[in-house]
């Protein structure tokens, strides 16, 4: 049986979240769903709409089997740290073998290409060149990936859910699968 992890804020839990859980179960068959969910504080540094216990209850009623808390330092951080913290919690649980996440474009190929690029020396060199021009980091990051891989792969960095998906892919250990 697969045990799937989902990293989320569920602020609040809605039908799209329930659909993700249902689609994950449909794609993988018999599986358990473990969620790493932010606590009282969410990624933008805001207080969640409802307390973490209420949101965890909504997730359980919406199809999750277990909800773990993503500690505040990771929950309120950048996409990279949010992803690393969430994947870290799921890996530490010792049972999750697949990560399920949403993407805006639906095509995972550019996400994988961007994730691989962000770990390369060529990327770091291109990024430094753009940063030296005094541009904001996010713009430099996207420009460096566009220079190396083209517009399609770089565009995913401008879409919040795809950007987070790229960071999930970067944080995944090799033994863990991904389902977008």
Where are these regions (language model features)?
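Acidic, Ser/Thr-rich peripheral helices and adjacent loops at domain boundaries
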Residues: 54-57, 122
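Active-site cores that bind ATP or allylic diphosphates and position pyrophosphate for catalysis
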Residues: 69-180
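Non-catalytic positions within long, well-ordered alpha-helices that form the structural scaffold/packing
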Residues: 25-26, 60, 87, 91-92
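Divalent metal-coordination and catalytic microenvironments
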Residues: 14, 59, 169
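N-terminal catalytic cores of NTP/NDP-binding nucleotidyl/phosphoryl-transfer enzymes
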Residues: 1-55
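A glycine-rich helix N-cap at a beta->alpha junction
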Residues: 56-72
């Amino acid at each position: 049986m697969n045990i799937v992890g989902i990293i989320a804020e569920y602020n609040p839990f809605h039908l799209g979240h329930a659909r993700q859980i249902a689609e994950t179960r449909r794609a993988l068959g018999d599986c358990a769903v473990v969620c790493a969910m932010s606590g009282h504080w969410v990624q933008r540094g805001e207080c969640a709409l409802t307390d973490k216990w209420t949101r965890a209850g909504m997730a359980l009623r919406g199809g999750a089997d277990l909800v773990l808390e993503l500690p505040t330092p990771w929950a309120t951080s950048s996409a990279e740290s949010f992803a690393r913290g969430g994947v870290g919690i799921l890996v530490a649980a010792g049972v999750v073998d697949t990560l399920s996440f949403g993407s805006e474009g639906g095509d995972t190929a550019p996400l994988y290409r961007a994730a691989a690029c962000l770990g390369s020396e060529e990327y770091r060199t291109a990024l430094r060149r753009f940063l030296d021009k005094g541009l904001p980091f996010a713009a430099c990051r996207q420009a460096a990936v566009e220079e190396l891989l083209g517009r399609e792969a770089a565009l995913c960095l401008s879409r919040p859910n795809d950007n987070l998906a790229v960071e999930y892919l970067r944080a995944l250990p090799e033994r863990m699968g991904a389902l977008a």
